[in-house]
């Protein structure tokens, strides 16, 4: 690999501000904020609005849309 052209790949704490969930992973994302992790070490902190901890697809809390009204309206409009 060529020196000085690749971003720094390091451990970073991601904080989902919606669910107040934090997880430690590796990333090239840069930030000026830091936080103290459970192991007592300080890591860069990246705040995110949504992650797998708060996204409806992963949490199973899907918002159900009332489609029965739409179906009835369609049948009523195109009934023969």
From Swiss-Prot:
Keyword terms: Ribonucleoprotein, Ribosomal protein
Domain of life: Bacteria
Keyword Mitochondrion listed: no
InterPro entries hit by this protein: Ribosomal_bL28/bL31-like_sf (IPR034704), Ribosomal_bL31 (IPR002150), Ribosomal_bL31_B (IPR027493), Ribosomal_bL31_sf (IPR042105)
Pfam family, one: Ribosomal_L31
Entry keyword Metal-binding: no
Single Gene Ontology MF annotation: structural constituent of ribosome
Database matches in Gene3D superfamilies: Ribosomal protein L31 (4.10.830.30)
GO terms for biological process, alphabetical: translation
Gene Ontology, cellular component aspect: ribonucleoprotein complex; ribosome
Extent of the signal sequence: none
HAMAP family named in the record: Ribosomal_bL31_2
Subunit: Part of the 50S ribosomal subunit.
Similarity section: Belongs to the bacterial ribosomal protein bL31 family. Type B subfamily.
The name this protein goes by in its record: Large ribosomal subunit protein bL31B
Organism: Xylella fastidiosa (strain Temecula1 / ATCC 700964)
């Amino acid at each position: 690999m060529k020196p000085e052209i690749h971003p720094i790949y390091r451990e970073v704490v991601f904080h989902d501000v919606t669910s107040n969930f934090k997880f430690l992973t590796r990333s090239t994302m840069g930030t000026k904020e830091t936080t103290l992790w459970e192991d007592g070490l300080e890591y860069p902190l990246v705040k995110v609005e949504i992650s797998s901890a708060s996204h409806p697809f992963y949490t199973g809390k899907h918002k159900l849309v009332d489609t029965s009204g739409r179906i009835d309206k369609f049948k009523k409009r195109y009934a023969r």
